[in-house]
């Protein structure tokens, strides 16, 4: 009897927490009616992602209502068709845990059939009080410098009160933030010890930034939450892309990526490399001993066995290297406080993570998400044996 009671208690705890998890999914619901506001049953409703080939279809019920569950964060177009009525379209933006409600009024078809396109204005997510900013792949590509591997312009250029100082991203005055991939956390408790990027911006499809008033299940990093929807391959048809650049300070940010999809399966993978002679923020106007470089790989796989199940796998492995900038003038005011002119130190940061998600839809109001993950992180501060004064090495390794 005690074992049964304990089992029921554990099961209750598990199921009570189903709704308390970070996610990248929302749902879209709506109603279709004629000019007299009578519901139209059996109308075909198609949901299409604007930035990829991902789509779902359904039909309205006897009440003229339709529902799409487990819709990833992003921008979508909904098309409603029914014989004897004009085709109608609307666009909508889905945020995590949101549930926008759409209304379609179908006009009686004329002899020359037309398509009515309704452009929906951007509105606040009424399902949440959390201030949210959504940045998509096109925004990153069109923002100067935002697609560089070490750049945070995709955040600082779009999010109020976001800025970078002493090489750390700050939001609302603090740098304790959380990163999530597909709604799965990539934890790192070594606050301010890591400088390398969590993901190359070129691998991002959508980035949802939350900056306060979020649910407790997101953790205790109270200054900001960055929820990444990586590129899936639904935007590709077995195609590859090579991105190269070259700029000041012998800077280059290069990537080779490829992806493709079928009706139920999509894949995306990339390799990237970057370097620059201007890495970290220098203590003075002169840039000395400040090179950086990095390389890595990223992969994303999505499989939909049936309409009620989805499997998502994301993996990343990269290494970054930074020289620690110095002030070369031994007589400067800064060197009188702490002499750095004799230092030749560096920071090396290997990092890798794997996240897996199984999303099962029981009904429109109950979705189960199982998301195991593993994250390896290391920050190695490496001092030169010729340092003056002597600096010790610091090795910090974490497994999550």
Please report, for each region that a protein language model flagged, where it lies by residue.
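Outer-membrane beta-barrel pore domains and translocons
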Residues: 83, 120, 212, 229, ...
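Transmembrane beta-barrel wall of Gram-negative outer-membrane proteins
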Residues: 246-275, 285-322, 346-367
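Membrane-embedded beta-strands of outer-membrane beta-barrel proteins
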Residues: 66, 169, 256, 297-299, ...
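Extracytoplasmic loops and strand-loop junctions of Gram-negative outer membrane beta-barrel proteins
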Residues: 136-139, 189-190, 209-210, 238-241, ...
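Periplasm-facing N-terminal accessory domains of Gram-negative outer-membrane beta-barrel systems
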Residues: 17-130
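Outer-membrane beta-barrel proteins
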Residues: 127, 253, 267, 276-282, ...
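Periplasmic N-terminal accessory/gating domains of Gram-negative outer-membrane beta-barrel systems
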Residues: 85-86, 90-107, 111-215, 225, ...
